[in-house]
Design a protein with these regions (language model features):
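Short, conserved acidic/polar surface loops in the N-terminal third of protein domains
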Residues: 1, 19, 43-45
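Conserved small helical "lid"/interfacial subdomain of P-loop NTPases
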Residues: 3-30
Length: 179
């Protein structure tokens, strides 16, 4: 029986930039900021389209392939229950809450062991990362951040503009909010 499991890590910037196949260094950097290093997201990029067209089609459009993958990622995690709370935590962190107390206040969740366990789970799954200062003391507050660039882009531009995306095209949102 095959029981070995290995978590596939996303590409770093160098390999993701090669996979994105844009010629300008600026476009490669922006592509990494929008799509991250997840090979599945990078594979959806159409090399015959501009960076703006790819972001609009894959991340901003209602039926965008990468957008759909990001929006359903938590639902596909084995053994993860009550995904609404995890989404609320991600939304709070993306909105600027970086410490556990801030996350609890912004998300409406209780700052207890349950929240800490959820934060640890999101770190283990690769959605969040823990950031400590170089000179942090053991009792200093831990800071959290969205770990994946594609999820960060989604939380920054798609989530807060859902109603706008229902009324306008992805190109209009791109022009008004992203570019």
């Amino acid at each position: 029986r095959f029981a070995w499991q290995h978590k596939l890590e996303p590409f770093d910037y160098w390999y993701a930039a090669e996979a994105a196949s844009f010629s300008s260094l600026r476009d490669r950097a922006i592509a990494y900021g929008a799509f991250g290093g997840t090979p599945r997201y990078l594979a959806a990029i159409d090399s015959g389209s501009t960076l703006a067209e790819n972001i609009q089609r894959l991340l901003l459009a209602k039926d965008g392939e990468v957008r759909a993958l990001l929006e359903t990622a938590l639902d596909q995690e084995d053994g993860l229950r009550d995904t609404a709370k995890y989404r609320t935590i991600l939304r709070a962190v993306a909105g600027g809450a970086t410490e556990r107390n801030e996350i609890a206040n912004r998300s409406g969740l209780t700052n207890d062991r349950g929240l800490r366990d959820k934060l640890d789970t999101l770190i283990e799954l690769g959605y969040l990362e823990r950031r400590d200062n170089v000179d942090a003391q053991p009792n200093d507050a831990v800071r959290y951040a969205i770990a994946d660039p594609a999820l960060r882009f989604h939380q920054r531009f798609v989530e807060p503009n859902r109603s706008l995306l229902e009324r306008q095209s992805a190109a209009q949102l791109w022009d008004a909010k992203v570019e």
